Amino acid sequence: QKIKVAGIYTQPIQQKWDARLHLALDAAAKRGEIEYVFSEKVSNTDYVRVLREYCASGIQLVVGEAFGISKEARKVADDYPEIAFLMGDPFKPHGNNFSVFDNYIHEPCYLMGIIAGNMTKANKIGMVGGYPIGEVNRLFHAFMNGALSVNDGIKFKVTFIGSWYDPPKAKEAAMAQVEAGVDVMYAERAGVVDACREKGIIAFGNVNDMNKEEDGTGVVVTSALWHMESAIDHAIERTKNGTFSAEEYHNWTMMAKGGATLAPYYEFEGKIPDSVKGQVADLSKKIMSGKFVVEINDNEPKSTF
């Protein structure tokens, strides 16, 4: 039996964060499990109106993001106790029907850091991100810690561009970091890979497979991938059988439940030492089994040179 699901996105569905939600919901729709409708480019000022309209239309599950409107979104959930809400949100679950998620892909970020720490020759690594908020900060810290675990002499340059999508600004920030001496970059935002290609240095990708999807061939060594399928499928199943409750879905976006992985090395397969690939493979198994825990640090990371 199909359930009706609405996706409400603040960005275009091509934007990588919302794209991961849309892909997972679209896959469920193609399997015939849900009837899926969505709205994109919904501003925070208009979000509650759109949310209420969907709730009044017979939707059974809403998937979206409440980062700028946490309190208001919870009020809507209170007004529609029969509807399930799965929202990107930095706070705790609410009531009986408001579950929260975020992208906890810090584990593959740590693994990328190990590779980066072995590949830098200058011992200077650059990172360009959107905003210094938890979901970005934790990824940067994990990447830094992974690099430092194999090379404690590395210094970092950190820049936030104040936008989720401004490729020219991200490229400019990356160019400035390369001028400052970095020879490896973490491309948290689109635009960084372009700078790395022009400057002849390598990069590591974020959320989506930037080697294949952002013209990163020969530049992007690997990417920390975020998969929302496990979380979305769990929410759909719970909604269908009437057991949906207010939960934290963080674990569903981590490696053990298939919510995060490391992308293939592609043409870098032969450029990464076998010993490093072996170390990453061994540590991946330990993370999956719970024998190794990657620290979560949501504090703003700072440049160290």
Predicted regions and their residues:
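A residue-level marker of the well-folded mature domains of exported/periplasmic proteins
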Residues: 1-305
